Structures are given as structure tokens and as C-alpha cells.
């Protein structure tokens, strides 16, 4: 069967990756941009040898933590709208285990990444090898089995010829908009170096065509009838709308029929914040404008959204007794949610075709959209001017910390900077085409409510898995996607401590990133959650054994890595640092000490969490009763 070429399994892998292309809207580009790797005994003499011999066009980066470099790869793919990827190669055992959190993050967000962890010996001759786990009930179990639940596709290669069918399946999954997610191919470390006579045809240029799925006539007719029969429809813009590139169609439909837009975290910056009908974030971390509009809507048009609990306020955000749902999604599974009328098709194409079927229609929102937006902009302006006072200060998160405790934080951290004031000063100062990234803590809520992105695809939030540590690592991925733009990681001290290894990688390869570190000396978001539900402040503040607030010099840590660092505890210092950071060629870190409880609170929203049904604390008993009361009005499924 044709000409053969003798290669090791690892050499065949690298040769194949170099020949993968993607074709979207008439544009054909290489799909695999490069590979992140940390070499260990499981991959250094296999994949390492193959890369050293001939990496082709693949860019190779040495990561510092397997989870971190996989986050960077995911962020790159997400920012490139899933049209390019990086592969990730790790050694066996702990290196592979470190991929689990990153794989879960990519899976929850439907982002394609190729994970290539090494595996134990296929021959089992030297078993148990270094970093191999042993189970009494099966010799076939390895650490890599932990990646099965968090991979869209998973395979183990124990013979060289298995690689061919496995790679074809993996790339089919990664290039399918409906199924996109992490593909994991585990390669036994002895098999990496084993040679085989591969068919040369396997290494020919392979183009993966991503054609836009068209809606059927039935779907279009049903969707148009639903919209025309509604009085107050609302468009919920999800990540699928961004990946589809549906900005123009969303604006056209919203303007023509006076339909307000609200956004999920993944959908934010699909349409600019200053578009008149864009009411901002929806749900638990949403704006008052969006949540008010949602309560009055009689039709929710979900465009590429998964309807997470944060978007639906745990299924209390809408008038479920009367409102109907129209879901436009390439994923049939997602389209089925909330008893919706389903259009399983591409968002951009569907909206374009729907636009022509709604002639003469106008919603009854009238001037309400403008009124809601103006009301919210006034609140946003107020939050930009919050000033701390040492007496009678009421923070946004009320009734948690006394004035004495807030003053203690101000004294120890030597700051009076409120978080919302700092965030909005940053939004005002950075260049409009800069890209910001965040993932966990209180900052995603502040960002979804307050951040104005007026250039499309400049807001990058990982809020499907909300994985602490994604922020700094992901910023490296942003820089690889946008080498000529400033990229900013907005990160709390909790997430920074969890993982920031790829800051060193960014410095090492001269890929400038900017880390904006908000330090309130604790896990502030979860501290709010525990206290909101009747508990005390328990092990969420960063305090010493003798109850003293920790004051860590994060700027000195980053300086030791080689970053240009700044300390900014006033708005004047912050703006000056931001302007100076723009002039730098090296990665920067701006450390801001911010006061706890000065992040935004929720607006007309509710989050269902597991409150203790039995407690000696009256406050917890009260919180449980309140939760049960809210569930009476929540949709059950």
C-alpha cells in the first residue's frame, strides 16, 4: 500500500502535527502553532528527540508547570476563536497528573487543546517504573486514566501503528465546533521511541474544513414565529456567538427590532460595551440593567450559551412560568436546555437568515433599554469614585467586617484603595485594544459588571471551570495570540499564589505580559460567600497563627524573576505605573493592596449553594430557610 517511511512514533507524531490545516470561511491556516513541553524521563528521549531532530514549523516552548503551560495553550486557542492550537507534552506520572485541572478547564469551556502525556511501558518489562502507580486490581491503570473524565477524546498508544487512527479521531474532535475540547493521547514511553514503517500518505497535508451548519426551514420558521409572537425578547450572547463571529448579525438584529443584548462571561466583548442596546453581563455577576431586563422578558434567545448557574442565577433570573426559550447552538445537547425551541446551527448564519424573516416586527421595550443602561452607567460611575473612610465607612459588601477590622487591613497593608475604584481606573487607562484575562475570585464579578470592552474579543474570562491559576498562565497564551498588543492578567493574591509559573516562561522568551495583582490578603470572594450564608470569617483571611494579617511583598517576588515591578496603593500611583508599564519591553507586575469587602456585590440575583440544613448557629438556620424559599420560585431543571 504505497510508499513507506520509517519513523519512531514520536517522530511520526511531530511530522503529522506539521501537516494539519483548518479551513474556515475561505481561509486556510496551519492548525497547530506549536508545542509546550516539560521534559522528563517519559518524553525527553522520545518526543524530545523528535522535536530536536525536526520540529518543522512548530514553535517549541519550555513550560515551568504542566498545568500552567496547558492553561497557556488553552488561552491561546480560546483567544484565536478555536482556530489554532498548541500541543502540550509531559512526562509520565506527576507531570501527567498536573494536566487534570487544565484539561477540566478546557473541557468546561469547549476549547481544543492536544494533550500528550507520556505513559508507562507498553512491554511492562521494567515495571514498576519511576513515577508509576500500582493497583492490585489492574496493571493497566496508570495516572493518565485520571484524564478520561476531563477529555473530549482519550486514547492510549501501546503500538506505533495505533497513532494513525488515534490522531485522525483527535483532530476530528478538536475541529468540530459542536464537540471541541481537549484531546488526550497518552503514549507509552517505550513506544515513543519504537520505529514503524508508516504510510507516507498519512503525512500528506490534511485540511479540516469547518463549514457553518445551516438551520433548516423548520427551525427558521419556528424561531421567527417565536420572536414575532413575543413582546419583550432578550438576546443572551454566549461564547458560541463569539466563536461564530456573529457580532455584526447581533447588532443588526438588536437595532432593527429593538431587542436588548445581555452577555455571559464567555460572550462578553462579542459586541462592544458602548453599543446602545448592550446591557452588559447577565446573572449572578451581572449588571442591574441586564438582570432587570431578563425578569421582564417573555422570550430568551440564547445564542451559543450553556446556561450555567451564573448566567441563570441558579435558574431564578427569568420568568420561567411565562417566558419561552429559543436556543441557537451548534451543540444539540446545549440547544435542548430549558425546554427551548432548538435551532442546531451556526449562530452567524442563523441570525443572518432570521433577520430577513422578521420584517415589520418591533419589541415593546421602547425606551426601557436606554433607561436601564443609563441607570447602570450611573451606578458604575459611583463605583469608580468610592473612597475609604476610617469612620462610618460602608463597603459594597456590607455587615461582614467592622470598621475596626477594615482599619486594621488599611494599617497593615498600608492602603486605602477600594477594589472597584482601582479596576475602573485601569479600564480607563489601558489601551482600548488591550486584552484582559481573569478566571477566579471576586474579580470576574467586578469585570463582568464594570469592565467596558470597546474592541471586540478583548475580554477573556475563563468562567466555565473558574480555575485559580489560569490568569497568569493564560496571559502568556494571549501574548502568543497578540504579539503586538498589551495583555493584562487581572488576578487576586489567592489565584497568584495558586499558580503563576508561566510568568517566568514569559520572561524567559521575551513575551511581555502585564500582571495586575489585587492583594486583599485572603480568599475574599469565598469569605463573602461564607459570611453571606451565616458563617463567620473562617480560614479565608490570610492571617498568621497569632491572628496577624499577612502582608506579602509580591512585587519583590516578581522582581526576583526578572519582571519590572511597581507598587500602587493610590489611584495616582496606579495610573502612573500603568503608563510606565506600557513603555517596558519586559513583563511587568503591578502590586495593588486593596481593601477587603470593596468589590461589587450582586444585583438582583441569587446563587444556589449548599447551606447547612442543621446548625447551632441561628444565622445559618436563617440562611437555610432563605435558600429554601428561593428554591420555591426556581426552575427545577
UniProtKB/Swiss-Prot annotation:
Region ranges (Thiamine pyrophosphate binding): 442-522
One Gene Ontology term, aspect cellular component: acetolactate synthase complex
InterPro entries to which the protein is assigned, alphabetical: DHS-like_NAD/FAD-binding_dom, Myo_inos_IolD, THcHDO_hydrolase_firmi, THDP-binding, Thiamin_PyroP_enz_cen_dom, Thiamin_PyroP_enz_TPP-bd_dom, TPP-bd_CS, TPP_enz
Named cofactor requirement(s): Mg(2+); thiamine diphosphate
Magnesium in keyword set: yes
Amino acids binding Mg(2+): 493, 520
Cofactor details (free text): Binds 1 Mg(2+) ion per subunit. Binds 1 thiamine pyrophosphate per subunit.
Domain of life (superkingdom): Bacteria
Pathway field: Polyol metabolism; myo-inositol degradation into acetyl-CoA; acetyl-CoA from myo-inositol: step 3/7
Membrane-spanning ranges: none
Annotated function: Involved in the cleavage of the C1-C2 bond of 3D-(3,5/4)-trihydroxycyclohexane-1,2-dione (THcHDO) to yield 5-deoxy-glucuronate (5DG).
PANTHER family in alphabetical order: 3D-(3,5_4)-TRIHYDROXYCYCLOHEXANE-1,2-DIONE HYDROLASE, THIAMINE PYROPHOSPHATE ENZYMES
Record's protein name: 3D-(3,5/4)-trihydroxycyclohexane-1,2-dione hydrolase
Gene behind this protein: iolD
Amino acid at each position: 500500500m504505497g510508499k513507506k517511511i520509517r519513523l519512531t512514533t514520536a517522530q511520526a507524531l511531530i511530522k503529522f502535527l506539521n501537516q494539519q490545516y483548518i479551513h474556515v470561511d475561505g481561509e486556510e491556516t496551519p492548525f497547530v502553532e506549536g508545542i509546550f513541553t516539560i521534559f522528563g524521563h517519559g518524553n525527553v528521549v522520545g518526543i524530545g528527540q523528535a522535536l530536536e531532530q525536526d520540529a518543522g514549523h512548530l514553535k517549541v516552548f519550555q513550560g515551568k508547570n504542566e498545568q500552567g503551560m496547558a492553561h497557556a495553550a488553552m488561552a491561546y486557542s480560546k483567544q484565536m476563536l478555536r482556530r489554532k492550537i498548541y500541543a502540550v507534552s509531559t512526562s509520565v506520572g506527576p507531570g501527567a497528573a498536573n494536566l487534570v485541572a487544565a484539561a477540566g478547564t478546557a473541557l468546561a469551556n469547549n476549547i481544543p487543546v492536544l494533550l500528550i502525556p507520556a505513559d508507562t511501558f507498553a512491554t511492562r518489562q521494567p515495571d514498576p517504573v519511576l513515577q508509576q502507580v500500582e493497583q492490585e486490581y489492574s496493571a493497566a491503570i496508570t495516572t493518565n486514566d485520571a484524564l478520561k473524565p476531563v477529555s473530549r477524546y482519550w486514547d492510549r498508544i501501546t503500538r506505533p501503528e495505533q497513532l494513525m487512527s488515534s490522531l485522525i479521531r483527535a483532530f476530528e474532535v478538536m475541529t468540530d465546533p459542536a464537540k471541541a475540547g481537549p484531546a488526550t493521547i497518552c503514549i507509552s514511553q517505550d513506544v515513543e521511541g519504537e520505529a514503524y514503517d508508516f504510510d507516507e500518505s498519512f503525512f500528506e497535508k490534511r485540511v479540516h474544513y469547518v463549514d457553518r451548519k445551516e438551520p433548516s426551514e423548520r427551525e427558521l420558521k419556528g424561531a421567527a414565529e417565536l420572536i414575532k409572537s413575543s413582546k419583550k425578547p432578550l438576546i443572551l450572547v454566549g461564547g458560541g456567538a463569539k466563536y461564530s463571529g456573529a457580532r455584526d448579525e447581533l447588532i443588526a438584529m438588536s437595532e432593527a427590532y429593538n431587542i436588548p443584548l445581555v452577555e455571559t462571561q464567555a460572550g462578553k466583548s462579542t459586541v462592544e460595551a458602548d453599543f446602545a442596546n448592550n446591557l452588559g453581563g447577565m446573572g449572578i455577576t451581572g449588571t442591574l440593567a441586564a438582570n432587570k431586563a431578563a425578569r421582564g422578558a417573555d422570550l430568551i434567545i440564547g445564542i451559543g450559551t450553556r446556561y450555567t448557574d451564573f448566567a441563570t442565577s441558579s435558574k431564578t433570573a427569568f420568568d420561567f412560568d411565562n417566558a419561552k426559550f429559543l436556543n441557537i447552538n451548534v451543540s444539540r445537547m446545549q440547544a435542548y436546555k430549558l425546554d427551548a425551541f432548538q435551532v442546531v446551527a451556526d449562530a452567524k448564519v442563523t441570525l443572518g437568515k432570521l433577520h430577513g424573516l422578521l420584517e415589520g416586527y418591533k419589541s415593546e421595550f421602547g425606551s426601557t433599554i436606554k433607561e436601564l443602561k443609563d441607570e447602570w452607567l450611573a451606578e458604575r460611575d459611583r463605583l469608580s469614585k468610592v473612597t475609604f473612610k476610617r469612620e462610618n465607612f460602608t463597603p459594597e459588601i456590607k455587615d461582614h467586617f467592622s470598621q475596626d477590622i477594615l482599619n486594621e487591613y488599611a494599617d497593615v497593608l498600608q492602603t486605602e484603595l477600594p477594589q472597584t475604584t482601582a479596576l475602573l481606573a485601569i479600564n480607563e487607562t489601558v489601551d482600548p485594544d488591550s486584552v484582559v484575562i481573569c478566571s477566579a475570585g471576586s474579580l470576574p464579578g467586578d469585570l463582568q459588571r464594570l469592565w467596558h470592552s470597546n474592541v471586540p474579543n478583548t475580554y477573556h474570562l475563563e468562567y466555565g471551570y473558574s480555575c485559580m491559576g489560569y490568569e497568569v498562565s493564560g496571559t502568556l497564551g494571549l501574548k502568543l495570540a497578540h504579539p503586538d498588543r498589551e495583555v493584562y492578567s487581572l488576578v487576586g493574591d489567592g489565584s497568584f499564589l495558586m499558580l503563576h509559573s508561566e510568568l517566568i516562561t514569559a520572561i524567559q522568551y521575551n513575551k511581555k505580559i502585564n500582571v495586575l495583582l489585587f492583594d486583599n490578603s485572603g480568599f475574599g470572594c469565598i469569605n463573602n460567600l461564607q459570611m453571606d450564608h451565616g458563617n463567620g470569617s473562617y480560614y479565608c483571611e490570610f492571617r498568621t497563627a497569632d491572628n496577624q494579617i499577612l502582608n506579602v511583598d509580591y512585587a519583590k517576588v516578581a522582581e526576583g524573576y526578572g519582571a519590572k515591578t511597581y507598587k500602587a496603593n493610590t489611584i495616582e500611583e496606579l495610573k502612573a505605573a500603568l503608563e510606565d508599564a506600557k513603555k517596558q519591553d519586559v513583563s511587568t507586575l503591578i502590586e495593588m493592596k486593596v481593601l477587603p469587602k470593596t468589590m461589587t456585590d450582586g444585583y438582583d440575583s441569587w446563587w444556589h449553594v449548599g447551606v447547612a440544613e442543621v446548625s447551632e448557629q441561628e444565622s445559618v438556620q436563617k440562611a437555610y430557610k432563605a435558600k429554601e424559599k428561593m428554591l420555591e420560585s426556581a426552575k427545577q431543571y
